[in-house]
Amino acid sequence: MKIGVLALQGDFDAHRQVLERLGADVVMVRKPEQLREIEGLVIPGGESSTFLKLLGDAGFEELRKFVTTKPSFGTCAGAIMLAKQVENPAQKGTGALDIRVRRNAYGRQIESAILTSECSLPGGEMEMVYIRAPRIEEVGPGVEVLAKRDGHPVLVRQGKVLAATFHPELTGDTRVHELFLKMVRNGNSGEK
């Protein structure tokens, strides 16, 4: 199974390491044509506005086509990229996930945190690393909330798309990546 990790900027290598430990064949995606080689895509954390600049209009459109039709997983900035609506400030998202997300909603870098929260994945509580994290302010009717922080969704799934506002790749817990790989294998939303 070939999994792409968008490797333009951000913490793409941490995702690569987790995915390889779980047995995936990882492609570091740096060009739009590489999207044709993969079965699923991870969009890592980083800076969403930088992703937009580096992708350009044509690259963004190729990304949008991929994430709206194939299994995709975004963390932090990647979740922003997958969103239907982005605020603080407003910017475009791919619309692959019916969420409204607020950039940097949990504060500046100094307010980053490592917290433990309940999640509905098998195994119970999960350690979650937040770094200038976005907050999901609203979810559409087809979005399943898998974990929350202070009443706000932090891990969500809709069809073939999974998003986390935290960084599961920075912990030893691989459950979120395992779920994504299951989604890719199943070609859909998978099972918990």
Curated annotation (Swiss-Prot):
Keyword vocabulary terms for this entry: Glutamine amidotransferase, Hydrolase, Lyase, Pyridoxal phosphate
UniProt key word Lyase: yes
Pathway field: Cofactor biosynthesis; pyridoxal 5'-phosphate biosynthesis
Catalytic activity as recorded in UniProt: aldehydo-D-ribose 5-phosphate + D-glyceraldehyde 3-phosphate + L-glutamine = pyridoxal 5'-phosphate + L-glutamate + phosphate + 3 H2O + H(+); L-glutamine + H2O = L-glutamate + NH4(+)
Amino acids binding L-glutamine: 46-48, 103, 131-132
Biological process per Gene Ontology, one example term: glutamine catabolic process
One MF annotation (Gene Ontology) recorded for this entry: glutaminase activity
InterPro entries hit by this protein: Class_I_gatase-like, PdxT/SNO, PdxT/SNO_CS
Gene3D superfamilies documented for this protein: 3.40.50.880
Residues forming the catalytic site: 76 (nucleophile), 167 (charge relay system), 169 (charge relay system)
Cross-referenced PROSITE patterns: PDXT_SNO_1, PDXT_SNO_2
Family affiliation: Belongs to the glutaminase PdxT/SNO family.
Role: Catalyzes the hydrolysis of glutamine to glutamate and ammonia as part of the biosynthesis of pyridoxal 5'-phosphate. The resulting ammonia molecule is channeled to the active site of PdxS.
Name recorded for this polypeptide: Pyridoxal 5'-phosphate synthase subunit PdxT
Gene: pdxT
